[in-house]
């Protein structure tokens, strides 16, 4: 049950749309991780995103041979903001592809402006 300290989870529309294409059981696991974030914690499948500033985290889930990723920010507003969801297909090992990093940066910038 949610406490009164639980923060709302808000989504950028494009991130929500991409997330809805994930398999149901992968979505359920990721929603559980986002719920932990909303309660002020950090699930074991979450790690800070390097190079994007403090308060930006990545949910990293390996599921049925795929690498599902959801990026969220906790220091933009009172909400936990999900800014990107994607299936990682990097040929660079564990590194997040540059185009995804650029997209995350752009969405974070636009979100900060929109919420001012």
What is each model feature region?
Residues 1-67, 76-79, 87-116:
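Basic, Lys/Arg-enriched alpha-helical interface segments
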Residues 83:
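Electropositive, glycine- and tryptophan-enriched low-complexity nucleic-acid-binding patches
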